[in-house]
Design a protein with these regions (language model features):
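C-terminal regulatory/oligomerization modules of transcriptional regulators
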Residues: 1, 124-157
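N-terminal leader segment of winged-helix/HTH proteins
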Residues: 1-29, 157
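N-terminal positioning helix adjacent to the helix-turn-helix/winged-helix DNA-binding module
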Residues: 6, 34-35, 98, 126
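Alpha-helical linker/hinge and terminal dimerization helices associated
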Residues: 17, 21-24, 59, 102-121, ...
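N-terminal helix-turn-helix DNA-binding core of bacterial DNA-binding proteins
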Residues: 20-62, 147-151
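Short, hydrophobic-biased segments on the C-terminal half of alpha helices
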Residues: 52, 70-71
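Charged, amphipathic alpha-helical coiled-coil/dimerization segments
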Residues: 71-129
């Protein structure tokens, strides 16, 4: 019974915090969080490019319409599609300089929202404890990047 109660709370908190973060981004005039997520993964990739299936697999948020998201990023000049030189049927999505700039600008609003809705409610020891509990459920906070990387627009996971 306690596991069910924990599950329900986990899902409710995740939904509420994501909704609040989305609203903060919207108020700041930015596109949805999925755009940030995709741009971040592209910026982290070698040469700034990934196959669409790799992008979908690496995104933090579930993205059921990755092809539509990629289309929007391309239309806005934040990414480009290019053919694989070896396999002409293969496609890559590559982040543009404009995409890198937007991802960094969005991080300012995103990180402020994380602080507002999570950081301000947890002490550092509480956050470490929460990461430990989530690790037991299969979410490894130990793979997180250092805080300095987060300040540069590349958040820890």
């Amino acid at each position: 019974m306690e596991a069910t109660a924990a599950w329900i709370r986990l899902m409710r908190v995740q939904t509420r915090v994501l909704d609040a973060v989305e609203q903060e981004l919207k108020k700041a005039g930015f596109p949805p969080l999925a755009w940030y997520d995709a741009l971040l993964e592209l910026s982290r990739a070698p040469s700034g490019e990934l196959r669409p299936v790799e992008l979908e697999r690496q995104m933090l948020l579930p993205q059921y319409s990755t092809s539509r998201l990629i289309e929007r990023l391309v239309d806005e000049g934040l990414a480009v599609r290019r053919e694989c030189k070896i396999d002409k049927r293969g496609l890559f999505v590559e982040i543009t300089e404009a995409g890198r700039e937007l991802q960094k600008k969005m991080w300012n609003a995103y990180s402020a929202a994380i602080e507002k809705y999570v950081g301000s409610k947890l002490s550092d020891p509480d956050a470490v404890k929460l990461c430990g509990l989530l690790d037991r459920l299969g979410c490894s906070c130990s793979e997180a990047k250092p805080a300095a990387a987060a300040r540069d627009g590349v958040p820890a996971r």
